[in-house]
Amino acid sequence: AKHLFLKCEQVGPLKYPDIYDIVKKCAERLELVVPIVFVRGDMDKAQVYSVASDIIEPCIVLSKQVVEMCSKEELMFLIGCECGRIQNNHCAYNMAFTYLNYNKYTYRPVERSYKQTVNNQLYTALVQWVKYADITANRAGIICLDKPGMFISVITGLYNKGYIDFYGRQQKNMDTDGLIKKAE
């Protein structure tokens, strides 16, 4: 598991204090113990992921690109989503999903993937699970926002900046105003 934390700097009150304040606020709003947060400098994509297991303390890893491109609200949403994944024990299933070779943008813990065929039922179950777990994580992210009504603007802003989520999904040129009208 140590390859997950290579070239990482731990967030704290002295290093990345703005991010540390966001993490504390999200943990408080979700009634969660403050997770460890790392900023990882060796990733080539703007991604965020969380890790937790019986042998690893719950932690969130932000790529340096995410830290540099995101506004405070966008970071609050992303960190809130990862806190939700930790709170709901989604981390193990998320890591299992990475080995399905779902698409080339999916986060992979190391440069290898599962080469054998995966049972169709297992594949379908994990893909469906990801869809519903992501809704739960987004709800946690919305709870963490100072202005939850800004969710659509925050999420479209992230994707329009080139954000690729943990599952490899990306969506450029999202129409914020069109989505807001549909939501009304």
Residue ranges and their predicted role:
Residues 14, 61-77, 128-131:
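Short pre-active-site segment immediately N-terminal to the catalytic Zn-binding motif
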Residues 70, 79-88, 136, 140:
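Active-site His/Glu-centered metal-binding helix of metallohydrolases
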Residues 14-20, 26-31, 109-180:
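Short helix/loop segments within enzyme catalytic domains
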Residues 82-103:
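Catalytic Zn2+-binding segment of zinc metalloproteases
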Residues 1-51, 56, 120-126, 162-163:
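Hydrophobic or amphipathic, alpha-helical segments that drive membrane association/targeting
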Residues 36, 91-98, 147-156:
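Acidic/histidine metal-binding catalytic segments
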